[in-house]
C-alpha cells in the first residue's frame, strides 16, 4: 500500500485506462486535474500545514480571498463524485482512506474497477463483481454525503449536475464539510462559482496549475426543508436535499411532461436532433419489442409507448441520471412499466417503458428486438468524438432480429450512412434538415 495519496497517484496514473469507454492516444484516464484535486485536499500534509493557499474568485483575478484552514485533519473517509476512471478513488484507497464514490457513467465505474485490478488493489473477476478494498460505490443521494467532512469532485460539464450535487452536499454533509472541486481550466466557467454559492457561503478558486484549477466550497447555507419528497437518481425516495430535482417541464409540441436530473442530456427539454426523429416517428414500424438506446430523459421511448400502448419498450442508458430521468418521464406520462439495473428482456415484462442502466446493449440478447431508436452521443466526458456511434451501431445489429430496424438521427456532417450500411444493413433516408439526418437501417 502506498504511504501517501500523491505516491499512489504517480504510480497508478500511467497504468490506468479508460476501457470499456472510448480509448485513443489523445484520451487519457488520469490527468493533471485529478492530481491537483488530490493535492489540494491536503491529505498528505502534516496537520499543522493544512491550510488553504491564497486564492482568487474565478473570473475575478484581482479579488483576494483570505487564508482559511481546511477540514482535512483526522479525515478517515472521503466522498468522491464524478471520478472519471478511478484516478481519485483508487489513490485514496491505496493510502488507507475509506472512499464513498459516485460515478454517473457505467463505463467509468467499470473502468475504475478494472483499473483497481491493473494497479494491484483488487483481484480479477467479472467486472461488476470486482471488489476494491476501501471503496464503496453509492447512488447520488443524501446518504452518500451524510456526515461527510471532505468531498472531492471532478466538476461536471452540466451546471444542472453541479447544482444537484451541491444541494445534496449542503443538506446532508457535516456543517464543517469542505468541498474541493476541480477540472481543466478550458472547461470551467464563472457560473460554476455561482452554482456552488447557492448552497455554500464561502466559495473560492485557487490559482491555476498545469492548465487545471480547483474551486473550494465550505460553510453550507441553512438547510431548506422540502415540501415533498421526490425520487432521487438512485430511483429511491430522496431525503431532503434534492429540492429542485428532477426538474419538470411540459413540451407543447409533443404534449410530453419531461423530467430531468441535473446530469441528463438536454435537461427537461427536447434537443433538436431528437425533435426531428420525433417528427417522423409515426412512420416507424408497429413493433412489440422496442429499445431506446442512449435514452437520456426517455423522450423517444415514452413517445413510442404512448402511440403503441401494447409495446414493450426498454429505455437504456449508461447514465444513472438518465435512467432516473427516463423513469420519472415515463411515470409522468402514464406509460411506466418498471425500472432498475437488471433489465427485462424485450421478450418479456409488462407493456410500457422500463428504464435500465446498461453499457450500450450489453445486457440484451441477440436478435431480441424489433425496433431500436438511437440518437448517438458524440461526447465522452468533455471530449468530442465520433468513436462512440460505431460501437452502438454494432450492438444494435446484434440485438435486432432479422428484418428489424434501427431508426437513427445523426449530425449530417458525420456521414454515418456507410457505417450503418456496413454494420446493420440496407439504409434509407427518412428525412433531413440543414443539420440532422434520420435514417432507417434494416437488419
Task: Cite the ranges covered by each PLM segment.
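Helix-to-beta-strand junctions that scaffold the AdoMet/dcAdoMet cofactor pocket
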Residues: 173-174, 400-402
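N-terminal auxiliary segments of SAM/dcSAM-dependent transferases
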Residues: 2-6, 23, 154-251
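C-terminal catalytic and target-recognition region of SAM-dependent MTase-like enzymes
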Residues: 406-443
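Conserved proline-anchored active-site loop of SAM-dependent methyltransferases
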Residues: 150-160, 293-301, 369-382, 396
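Conserved SAM/SAH cofactor-binding pocket of Class I
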Residues: 35-47, 73-124, 271-374
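Class I SAM-dependent methyltransferase Rossmann-like catalytic core
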Residues: 2-44, 262-267
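Conserved SAM/SAH-binding loop
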Residues: 139-143, 356-362, 435
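SAM-dependent Rossmann-like transferase core, predominantly class I methyltransferases
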Residues: 27-31, 36-40, 210-289
Amino acid at each position: 500500500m502506498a504511504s501517501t495519496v500523491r505516491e499512489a497517484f504517480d504510480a497508478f496514473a500511467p497504468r490506468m485506462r479508460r476501457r470499456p469507454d472510448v480509448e485513443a492516444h489523445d484520451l487519457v484516464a488520469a490527468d493533471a486535474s485529478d492530481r491537483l484535486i488530490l493535492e489540494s485536499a491536503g491529505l498528505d500534509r502534516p496537520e499543522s500545514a493544512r491550510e488553504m493557499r491564497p486564492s482568487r474568485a474565478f473570473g475575478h483575478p484581482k479579488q483576494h480571498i483570505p487564508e482559511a484552514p481546511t477540514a482535512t485533519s483526522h479525515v478517515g473517509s472521503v466522498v468522491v463524485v464524478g471520478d472519471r476512471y478511478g484516478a481519485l478513488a483508487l489513490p485514496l484507497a491505496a493510502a488507507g482512506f475509506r472512499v464513498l464514490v459516485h460515478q454517473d457513467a457505467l463505463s467509468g465505474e467499470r473502468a475504475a474497477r478494472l483499473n483497481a485490478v491493473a494497479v494491484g488493489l483488487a483481484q480479477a473477476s467479472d467486472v461488476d463483481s470486482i471488489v476494491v478494498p476501501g471503496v464503496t460505490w453509492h447512488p447520488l443521494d443524501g446518504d452518500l454525503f451524510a456526515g461527510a467532512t471532505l468531498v472531492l469532485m471532478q466538476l461536471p460539464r452540466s451546471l444542472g449536475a453541479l447544482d444537484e450535487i451541491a444541494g445534496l452536499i449542503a443538506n446532508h454533509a457535516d456543517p464543517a464539510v469542505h468541498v474541493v472541486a476541480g477540472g481543466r481550466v478550458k472547461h470551467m466557467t464563472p457560473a460554476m462559482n455561482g452554482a456552488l454559492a447557492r448552497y455554500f457561503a464561502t466559495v473560492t478558486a485557487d490559482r491555476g496549475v498545469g492548465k487545471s484549477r480547483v474551486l473550494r466550497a465550505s460553510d453550507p447555507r441553512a438547510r431548506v426543508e422540502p415540501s415533498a419528497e421526490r425520487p432521487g437518481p438512485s430511483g429511491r425516495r430522496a431525503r431532503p436535499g434534492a429540492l429542485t430535482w428532477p426538474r419538470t417541464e411540459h413540451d407543447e409540441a409533443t404534449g410530453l411532461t419531461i423530467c430531468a436530473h441535473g446530469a441528463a442530456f438536454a435537461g427537461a427539454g427536447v434537443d433538436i436532433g431528437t425533435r426531428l426523429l420525433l417528427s417522423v416517428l409515426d412512420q416507424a414500424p408497429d413493433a412489440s419489442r422496442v429499445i431506446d438506446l442512449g435514452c437520456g430523459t426517455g423522450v423517444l421511448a415514452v413517445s413510442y409507448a404512448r402511440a403503441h400502448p401494447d409495446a414493450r419498450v426498454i429505455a437504456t442508458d449508461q447514465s444513472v441520471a438518465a435512467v432516473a430521468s427516463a423513469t420519472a418521464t415515463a411515470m409522468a406520462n402514464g406509460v411506466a412499466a418498471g425500472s432498475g439495473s437488471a433489465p427485462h428482456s424485450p421478450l418479456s415484462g409488462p407493456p410500457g417503458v422500463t428504464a435500465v442502466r446498461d453499457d450500450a446493449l450489453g445486457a440484451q440478447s441477440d436478435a431480441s428486438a424489433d425496433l431500436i431508436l438511437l440518437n448517438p452521443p458524440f461526447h465522452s466526458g468533455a471530449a468530442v468524438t465520433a468513436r462512440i456511434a460505431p460501437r452502438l451501431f454494432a450492438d444494435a445489429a446484434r440485438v435486432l432480429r432479422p428484418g428489424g430496424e434501427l431508426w437513427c438521427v445523426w449530425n449530417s456532417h458525420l456521414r454515418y450512412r456507410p457505417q450503418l450500411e456496413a454494420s446493420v444493413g440496407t439504409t434509407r433516408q427518412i428525412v433531413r434538415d440543414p443539420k440532422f439526418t434520420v435514417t432507417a437501417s434494416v437488419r
